[in-house]
Amino acid sequence: LVARYPSIASPLVILARGYSRELPGNTHAEANALAKARTLSPERLSEMFPSAEEETPRGPDIDDVLAHTDVYTTLEPCSVRTSGLAPCADALVAAKVPRCFIGVGEPDDFVQCEGAQKLRAAGCQVVWVKGLEEECLSAARRGRQT
């Protein structure tokens, strides 16, 4: 998750990173990154975004920060979870993430995915990163349990 907060002119800040199965349970990268971002204290957010206090006396709020955050992901955010957990696309929509950069679509042998469509329908700009598809798919398959 890369934040552009409080304004588009502010420097980029890496808010959180995540990878599949990083946190307990059958967790995915986007959900893990969001969960980790939500653990940032108000003090830490103020350190990361000092100019936010000029715009908001209370300092940055994680929901405001996420609404100015770009997501970079190797694999299309899932739209269906066979584990019963919430799909990553739904979590990104709930966080009001405005833009998602995706390295490769989820292959049919994983699950039928409509993550990019869900994001677009919610007003999130989806950017397909060209030229890294094979590397992204290879990374996704390495972590896949068959």
Question: Model-flagged regions — what are they?
Answer:
Residues L1-S10:
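Short beta-strand scaffold segments in enzyme catalytic cores
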Residues I14-L137:
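Zn2+-dependent cytidine deaminase-like catalytic core
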Residues A116, A139-T146:
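Short, surface-exposed amphipathic charged segments that create phosphate/polyanion-binding patches used
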